[in-house]
Every structure is written in structure tokens, then in C-alpha cells.
A protein has these predicted regions:
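A contiguous, well-ordered beta/alpha segment that forms the leading edge of an enzyme domain
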Residues: 3-159, 175-186
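Conserved beta-strand edge residues that scaffold enzyme active sites
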Residues: 113, 192-193
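Loop-centered beta-sheet repeat module
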Residues: 162-175, 186-190
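Conserved small/polar residues in nucleotide/adenosyl-binding loops
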Residues: 194-201
Length: 202
């Protein structure tokens, strides 16, 4: 569930029918977008912890603007081989399989193109075709090789995982909720991507 405009995932886990379920809502900001959280639980409100998990995923693995993130370090080492965490290696394996399966219609190496548009920056604009043509020579999922936890980017290639970040965040939250027996359901909506999780009642 790494990429998509809309995705719904339902997981059934037994919850006692006579237990009073509370509804908690929260609006957060992560991954450059508004995140709406609705939690149904017989326990504590976990929305703050869930929002923090999404931000942690962004800053530790995915953000190209945070120089301490693994993706930023990969981009900075373009042309060299870099060792990444098992978690990021797993994400990248799925991401590049998606790129391969789509024949490059989805391509995570468009980092330089994204920077050129500067959509979230101070000077968002539509670039000239000549500018795009110049940078397209560094685009192509084939410019990245994966060998376990070792990743090699060809010189000039730049990764941007913005298209998959929300899906990764939803997957991490889903795994976290599987460990929370008090949670009976959740709707997590980072604007362009919706994740649903429900527990079955007896």
C-alpha cells in the first residue's frame, strides 16, 4: 500500500461488544499536508502518538529537505554506494518494483524535477520545457541499484519519495494499531490518501 490516491484497508480483530468505545478526533500536519485522524478505542487517545509516528517516518527516512534523513543522505552521496536501514531498504524494494511494473510511469528518481517546480517552496512556478529537458537526463528508475541494504545512485540521480510517503506512513500506523488491543477502528486521512482500519465485534 505504498502509492495511490485512495486506498482502504480493513483488518478484523475481535473486540468485546459490551465495551464502551470512545471516539477521538485530531487534525495534524505532516508530510506537507493536513492529516485528519479519527480513532475509536476503549483506551487512551493515541492520535498524538500516531501523528508523531508519521512525522518520525518523514524525518528519519523520507524527507529530502532534512539533511539527516536517509533519503537526503542518499541523494548527497549520488554516484556512490550507501548503506541504509533495513526499513528503508524494504520500502525502496517495493517502490522500485512498482516503478518497474509501471514501466517508469511511476518513477521515484524525479527529485530534480520536483525541486524545479518548487511547489512547497518560496517560488513555485511552471518551469520552461528547456529546463525540464536538461534535468530529464538524470531521471530513470534504472539509475538506482539495490543490493540488500546497499543502494547506489548513478551520479546526478535524485530520489523523491513524496508519491509514496503517505502510503508508507499509513502502513506504519496500521502496524502500530495491530499492537493496540483497545483500538476498535481508525480513519487516517492525509488529504490525498485514506487509510481505514476496523476491528470486528463479537
Amino acid at each position: 500500500m505504498l502509492c495511490g490516491v485512495f486506498c482502504a484497508a480493513l483488518t478484523a480483530v475481535p473486540v468485546l461488544a459490551d465495551t464502551e468505545v470512545q471516539k477521538y478526533t485530531n487534525t495534524d500536519f505532516a508530510m506537507d499536508t493536513v492529516v485528519s485522524e479519527t480513532l475509536y478505542t476503549t483506551g487512551d487517545d493515541l492520535n498524538t502518538a500516531i501523528g508523531q509516528k508519521i512525522r518520525d517516518i518523514e524525518t528519519e527516512y523520507l524527507s529530502w529537505t532534512d539533511e539527516d534523513s536517509q533519503i537526503a543522505k542518499l541523494n548527497a552521496a549520488s554516484g556512490e554506494t550507501t548503506e541504509v536501514s533495513d526499513e528503508l531498504a524494504g520500502y525502496l524494494e517495493k517502490i522500485f518494483q512498482l516503478a518497474k511494473d509501471s514501466n517508469g510511469a511511476f518513477d521515484p528518481t524525479i527529485g530534480k524535477i520536483i525541486r524545479l517546480w518548487d511547489i512547497t517552496g518560496e517560488n513555485p512556478h511552471v518551469p520552461e520545457q528547456s529546463e525540464l529537458d536538461e534535468l530529464l537526463k538524470d531521471v530513470g528508475y534504472q539509475k538506482v541499484s539495490l543490493d540488500g541494504d546497499k543502494v547506489t545512485l548513478e551520479k546526478g540521480a535524485t530520489l523523491d519519495l513524496g508519491a509514496t510517503g503517505k502510503g508508507i506512513g499509513c502502513d506504519v500506523v496500521s502496524d502500530f494499531l495491530k499492537t493496540q488491543e483497545d483500538v476498535s477502528g481508525m480513519i487516517l486521512n492525509p488529504v490525498s490518501y485514506t487509510h481505514l482500519r476496523a476491528h470486528e465485534t463479537d
